[in-house]
Amino acid sequence: MAARLITEGERVANEGNDALVEALRDELRAAGLGRVILLGRLEHMRGPRLKVGLARWGFQVLVPPAAEQAWLEQAIVAAMEEGVPRRADVEHLAALIAEGSEHGVEGLVLACEELSPLVGACGLELPLVEAWMLQGREA
């Protein structure tokens, strides 16, 4: 099955400041990134906080389609349970990200710490911003 990405086109009114989104905005701007793939647990990819929050600042945020999101959730859980990412999961994720690169993606936003070993095993050259590391800067 070919990995496919979709663009999140939803918009919501600005509901005030979100320190995490602002920290991500600053990191993405500093890295010169405008079009990114958001990867994480289901709640991160499906929820509006990061997608819509970054879109309000002019970033184009892509997320995998629902089937790929469900697969990624399972891959994260398997890597946590087994202590290392499965080779097939690493290859699948690398293909998903490579497809994003073919569609102009400039970098990755990782929304959860548990995803870092899986992405790290892909050996990618795309820049990444780890949202979970910015949590402490929310205050």
PLM regions with names:
Residues 1-139:
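Non-catalytic structural scaffold of enzyme domains
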